Amino acid sequence: MKPRSGDKLKIDGIKLSGELVQINLLPGTDFSAARLFCEMAGRRINMPLVTLDAAADRLAGACCIAAEDLARAQPVLEAASGALQVIERVGSLTVFPHRARFDLFECMLSGFARRGLPVHAIASSLAALTFTTDYGRLDEAAAAVLEKAALPDNHAPFRPEFKVRQI
């Protein structure tokens, strides 16, 4: 149900990530997403965000790793430097539930534009809509969304309090 003019969109939550490194898989190269994922898995590097785009038999996309995993990922990134773009100091902002609501996407995109916030990647599912932006501006990104969207009473954007690491 679309809100009346002046009403805010109702959302259930906003999750902000810790500091991430975004790895963009560039189209038109011989380096595959499967190879990237296998290389990261072999180094026990978790990817908390993955989004892929397939068009005309070409695969492009982005994934994120924790900033503290960058040194362990460096050999993979250097070996595939022409096929990857690396963006450091990225964070993700996830709004839920999404439920394929175009008005929520519009709210987030226009909020980012009003504040001049970069959008490095967008990922969606029926449950959530995620934007990546500059890590140092995540709180500003949340404020931009909350100009047009409303959380339930006694809720605020949250960050993870702990992280599980594979050993």
Predicted regions and their residues:
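A conserved regulatory-domain signal marking ACT and ACT-like small-molecule sensing domains
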Residues: M1-I167
